[in-house]
C-alpha cells in the first residue's frame, strides 16, 4: 500500500478502497495508529520539537556559550581545573534555569492550543468520532459538511449537494460541485470533480470521502514545500532579530578589541580569551529567547482567563500594538439573533405566499448554518410532505443568492432568495398582491422605495423570487434568469446592549473600530448610529471597486463603515489600512473571512466559527464579543510591556558594567573580574529578570498602542549604559584611590556593586513612574531581595573563597552602599529626562 494512489480520480470507489486496504466503515483504531506511525503526522511541516532534550540543548547552542565551553575545557586540561569546573557549573545552572522556565511555558501553551484544536469527523471501528486533523491517515473515511476544511487529499465516496471552494489551490472564484465519478487519468486538477484537496473547504452540502494523501504528500503540501511557505514575520519578531544583530555587532567589536589589547599587553592568552568570552556572555542577553517564551506563555495564560486563546504567541505583541480593529457587525456588534419581522409582497403587505416560498428555500438549503435561514425556519413552520428537494445552487459571495429546486405534483419549482439587488437582476416579472404577473419594470421603483424605507430603519431586507421549470429536474447558475419577483423578507438584528460602552473602551485604548459588512449602506448607517458612531463615514463596495489602490490609501483611514462589501474586497481594505501604517486586527468567523484573516496583522476568529477561519486565525475568542477583545488587548499590551522591560534591563546595567570592565581591563595590571566572577554576575542578575512575566504593568503602558522601536532601545542602552558606567568608574576610583584595595578586595567590591546595583536597577527601569510609586510583583521583589542578600553573604562563605571573593570591612561596604544609592537616584533622574525626550 502506498500513500496517495496514482490518479485516484480515475478509480472506482471499490478500486480505491482496495488500493488503500480499507473498508466503507473506515479503519480500525489499531490500523489507524499503525498508519500514523508509518506516514507521520498530517502536517505540511513537522511540528517544532519541544521534547526535553531539544529544549535543553537549545539553552547551550549559542555560539558564544559553545566557544566558552570549549575554552573552559582547554583551561581544565592546561592549568586550572577548579576554575574551569566553576565556570562550567555556572553555565550549566544558567542553562537549566532557562530550560526549566521555557519547558513550563511550552507545556502551558500546548494546553491552551488544545482548546481550539481543529478536528475532523472520521469513521473508526465503525463509529463516527472527532479526532485532531493531525491524526488523519491515508485510508480514513472522513465525513464533511459545510464549513469544514478538507483534512487531506480525498476521493468522494458519497455526496449530497456538495460544493467546495478551491480558490486557494486553483484560483476558481466560484464553488465547485463535487460528486462520485470515474475520470480519465489525465484530467486536469481543476476538473477533477470527484477529488477533494487538502486545505480547501466545503461551502455547502455533505460528503463521505476516502483520504488518499496527507501532509506533504497532498497537492497543497507539494505547493507549500516548493514555496517554503512560512508565517509572516511580525514587528515583534523583526524587532527582536534586529536587536540581536545590534548587540552581536557591539559584542563582536568590543570583545575582539579587548582580547587583542590584552594579548598586546603580554597577559596570558588563555586568561585573556576566557575574560573576553565571559564579557561577551555578559553583554549578550542569553536568556532573551527563554524570557520571551516565558513572557508570551504567561500572557497567553492570562489572556485565556479572559477567554482569548492565542494560537501564535508572536501575535500577542501585534495584538497589543493594534490600533484598528475591523469587524463584521452580525453577532459581534449585534445580538447575532436574527429575527424575521415580516414577509411582504411587492406592495409591502404581509404575504403568506412569500413566507412559504422563503421557508421552502431555507428548509432545503444545505449550506453552512446561518442565522437568516434559522430565523425563517423558526418564524413559522409549514407542511412540506408534498415537496421533494431535487437540486440546489448554494449561496456564494459573488451571486449573493441561493436557489433550490423542489418537485411538487410532477413539476419542478425553483425558489431563489438573497440580496435584493442580486435577486432583482435575474427577474423579468413580478407578482402583485392580486396574483397578477406584471413586467418587472412596472413595479421596480415601488420595490426599490420599499427596500430603502426598510433599510433606513435598520432592517436587513432580502428578495424572494421563483420560476416554474416544468419537467426540468436539474438547475445551474444559468437557470437563474427570467424569474418572477415575489416579495421581501424583513429581518432585524439589534445592537448588543453593551456595545456603546465596549466601543468607548476600545477608543480609550487607542483602538478605532471599522465595520466591514455585506449589508447595504442604509442598514449599515442606521446600525452604526444605534451604536453611538455619529457622523459615520461610509464607503460602499461598488465605490471601492472604482478606486485605485492609491486613491483607497488616501481614504481608507477616514472611513468608519464599509458597506455592501464583497469577500475579496475585505482583504484589499485590510492591506490598505496596513500600508497606511496601522496595525490591523480583523475579526471574522465566516467562510468568506479566511483571506482577510491572513492579510491582517492579527487574525481573530471565534470558537464557534467555521474551521477554515479558526485555522487562519492567530487568536481565537471563546465568546463572540468585543468586550472579550478589550480585555485581550489589555493583556497583550501587558505582555509586550513586560518583554520590553527585560530588553531595557539587559541593555542598561549589564551593558554598562561589562563596558566599564572592558575599559578598565586596559589600565589595570590584573583582570578586574575573573571569568567565573563575570559569569556569576550575569547569572545572579538574570535571576530577578526571570520573574518579569509576573510583574505588574502601569496603566499608562496599556492605555495606547505601542510598537517595537529599535532606535528608542538603542538610545535607552546608551543613556543608561553611560549612567551605569559613571558609577562603575566611581566605584573603581573609591576602591583603588581611596581604599587602596588589594586585587581580591577590588574584585569583591566591584562584584558586590555590580550585582546589587544591577538587581536594584530593575525596580527603577520596570516603570516610568518613580520606583516607590509603582509596586512590583511579589515574585520580582522577592527575587531581587534574595539576590541582594545572597550577594552580600557570598564573600563570607567557603564558596565565596573558591570564587575568589573575600569578606570586606565596613569601611569598604559603606562607600559601596553610598555609590549604589546615588546610582539609583541618578537612574531615576535619567529615566525622567529620557522619557520626556524619547517616545517609546
Annotate each predicted stretch with a short phrase.
Residues 58-77, 91-95, 99, 118, ...:
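Alpha-helical transmembrane segments of multi-pass membrane proteins
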Residues 254, 258, 531, 535-586, ...:
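Membrane-embedded transport module
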Residues 195-203, 318-485, 491, 504, ...:
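Cytosolic catalytic regions of ATP/NTP-dependent phosphoryl-transfer enzymes
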Residues 41-73, 106, 128-129, 186-195, ...:
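Soluble-to-membrane junctions at the N-terminal ends of transmembrane alpha-helices
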Residues 163, 169, 180, 335-357, ...:
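Basic, amphipathic juxtamembrane/active-site segments
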Residues 66-86, 246-284, 297, 301-307, ...:
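Helix-interface capping motifs at the ends of transmembrane segments in multi-pass membrane proteins
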Residues 1-128, 134-137, 142-150, 155-163, ...:
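Non-lumenal N-terminal regulatory segments of integral membrane proteins
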Residues 83-117, 124, 231-324, 489, ...:
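Hydrophobic alpha-helical transmembrane segments
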Amino acid at each position: 500500500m502506498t500513500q496517495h494512489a496514482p490518479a485516484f480520480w480515475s478509480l472506482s470507489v471499490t478500486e480505491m478502497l482496495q488500493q488503500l486496504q480499507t473498508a466503507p466503515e473506515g479503519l480500525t483504531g489499531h490500523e489507524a495508529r499503525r498508519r500514523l506511525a508509518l506516514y507521520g503526522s498530517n502536517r505540511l511541516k513537522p511540528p517544532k520539537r519541544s521534547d526535553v532534550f531539544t529544549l535543553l540543548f537549545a539553552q547551550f547552542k549559542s555560539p558564544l556559550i559553545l566557544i566558552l565551553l570549549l575554552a573552559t575545557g582547554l583551561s581544565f586540561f592546561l592549568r586550572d581545573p577548579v576554575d574551569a569546573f566553576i565556570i562550567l557549573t555556572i553555565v550549566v545552572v544558567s542553562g537549566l534555569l532557562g530550560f526549566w522556565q521555557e519547558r513550563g511555558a511550552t507545556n502551558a501553551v500546548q494546553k491552551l492550543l488544545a482548546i481550539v484544536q481543529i478536528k475532523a469527523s472520521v469513521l473508526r471501528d465503525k463509529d463516527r468520532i472527532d479526532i485532531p486533523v493531525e491524526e488523519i491517515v491515508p485510508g480514513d473515511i472522513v465525513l464533511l459538511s459545510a464549513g469544514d476544511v478538507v483534512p487531506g487529499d480525498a476521493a468522494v465516496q458519497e455526496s449530497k449537494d456538495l460544493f467546495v471552494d478551491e480558490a486557494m489551490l486553483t484560483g476558481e472564484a466560484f464553488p465547485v460541485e463535487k460528486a462520485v465519478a470515474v475520470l480519465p487519468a489525465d484530467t486536469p486538477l481543476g476538473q477533477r470533480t470527484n477529488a477533494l484537496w487538502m486545505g480547501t473547504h466545503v461551502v455547502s452540502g455533505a460528503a463521505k470521502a476516502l483520504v488518499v494523501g496527507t501532509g506533504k504528500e497532498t497537492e497543497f503540501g507539494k505547493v507549500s514545500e516548493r514555496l517554503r511557505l512560512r508565517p509572516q514575520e511580525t514587528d515583534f519578531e523583526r524587532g527582536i532579530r534586529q536587536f540581536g544583530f545590534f548587540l552581536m555587532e557591539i559584542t563582536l567589536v568590543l570583545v575582539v578589541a579587548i582580547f587583542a589589547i590584552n594579548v598586546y599587553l603580554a597577559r596570558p592568552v588563555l586568561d585573556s580569551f576566557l575574560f573576553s568570552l565571559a564579557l561577551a556572555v555578559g553583554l549578550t542577553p542569553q536568556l532573551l529567547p527563554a524570557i520571551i517564551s516565558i513572557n508570551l506563555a504567561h500572557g497567553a495564560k492570562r489572556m485565556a482567563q479572559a477567554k482569548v486563546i492565542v494560537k501564535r504567541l508572536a501575535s500577542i505583541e501585534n495584538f497589543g500594538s493594534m490600533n484598528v480593529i475591523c469587524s463584521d457587525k452580525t453577532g459581534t456588534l449585534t445580538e447575532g439573533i436574527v429575527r424575521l419581522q415580516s414577509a411582504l409582497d411587492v406592495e409591502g403587505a404581509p404575504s403568506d405566499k412569500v413566507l412559504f416560498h422563503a421557508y421552502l428555500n431555507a428548509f432545503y438549503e444545505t449550506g453552512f448554518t446561518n442565522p437568516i435561514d434559522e430565523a425563517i425556519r423558526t418564524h413559522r413552520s409549514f407542511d412540506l410532505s408534498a415537496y421533494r428537494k431535487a437540486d440546489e445552487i448554494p449561496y456564494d459571495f459573488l451571486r449573493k443568492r441561493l436557489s433550490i429546486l423542489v418537485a411538487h405534483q410532477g413539476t419542478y419549482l425553483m425558489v431563489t432568495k438573497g440580496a435584493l439587488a442580486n435577486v432583482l437582476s435575474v427577474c423579468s416579472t413580478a407578482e402583485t398582491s392580486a396574483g397578477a404577473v406584471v413586467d418587472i419594470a412596472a413595479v421596480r421603483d415601488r420595490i426599490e422605495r420599499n427596500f430603502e424605507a426598510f433599510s433606513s430603519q435598520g432592517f436587513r431586507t432580502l428578495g424572494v423570487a421563483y420560476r416554474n421549470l416544468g419537467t426540468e429536474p436539474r438547475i445551474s447558475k444559468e437557470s437563474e434568469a427570467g424569474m418572477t419577483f415575489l416579495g421581501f423578507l424583513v429581518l432585524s438584528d439589534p445592537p448588543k446592549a453593551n456595545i456603546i460602552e465596549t466601543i468607548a473602551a476600545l477608543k480609550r485604548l487607542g483602538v478605532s473600530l471599522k465595520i466591514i459588512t455585506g449589508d447595504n449602506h442604509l442598514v449599515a448607517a442606521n446600525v452604526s448610529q444605534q451604536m453611538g458612531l455619529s457622523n459615520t463615514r461610509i464607503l460602499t463596495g461598488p465605490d471601492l471597486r472604482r478606486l485605485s489602490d492609491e486613491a483607497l490609501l488616501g481614504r481608507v483611514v477616514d472611513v468608519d463603515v464599509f458597506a455592501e462589501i464583497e469577500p475579496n474586497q475585505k482583504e484589499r481594505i485590510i492591506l490598505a489600512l496596513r500600508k497606511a501604517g496601522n496595525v490591523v486586527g480583523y475579526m471574522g468567523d465566516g467562510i468568506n473571512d479566511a483571506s482577510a484573516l491572513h492579510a491582517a496583522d492579527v487574525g481573530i476568529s471565534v470558537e464557534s466559527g467555521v474551521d477554515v477561519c479558526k485555522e487562519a486565525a492567530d487568536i481565537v475568542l471563546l465568546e463572540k464579543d468585543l468586550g472579550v477583545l478589550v480585555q485581550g488587548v489589555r493583556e497583550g499590551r501587558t505582555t509586550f510591556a513586560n518583554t520590553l522591560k527585560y530588553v531595557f534591563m539587559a541593555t542598561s546595567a549589564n551593558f554598562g558594567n561589562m563596558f566599564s570592565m572592558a575599559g578598565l581591563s586596559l589600565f589595570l595590571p590584573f583582570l578586574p573580574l575573573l571569568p567565573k566572577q563575570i559569569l556569576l554576575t550575569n547569572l545572579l542578575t538574570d535571576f530577578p529578570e526571570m520573574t518579569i512575566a509576573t510583574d505588574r504593568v502601569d496603566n499608562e503602558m496599556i492605555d495606547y498602542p505601542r510598537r517595537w522601536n529599535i532606535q528608542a532601545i538603542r538610545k535607552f542602552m546608551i543613556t543608561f549604559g553611560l549612567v551605569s558606567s559613571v558609577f562603575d568608574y566611581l566605584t573603581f576610583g573609591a576602591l583603588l584611590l581611596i581604599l587602596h584595595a588589594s586585587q581580591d578586595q577590588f574584585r569583591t567590591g566591584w562584584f558586590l556593586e555590580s550585582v546589587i546595583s544591577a538587581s536594584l536597577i530593575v525596580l527603577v527601569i520596570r516603570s516610568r513612574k518613580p520606583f516607590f510609586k509603582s509596586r512590583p510583583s511579589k515574585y520580582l521583589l522577592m527575587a531581587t531581595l534574595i539576590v541582594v542578600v545572597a550577594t552580600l553573604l557570598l564573600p563570607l562563605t567557603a564558596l565565596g573563597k573558591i570564587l575568589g571573593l573575600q569578606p570586606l570591612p565596613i569601611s569598604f561596604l559603606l562607600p559601596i552602599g553610598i555609590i549604589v544609592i546615588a546610582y539609583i537616584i541618578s537612574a531615576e533622574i535619567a529615566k525622567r529626562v529620557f522619557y520626556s525626550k524619547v517616545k517609546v
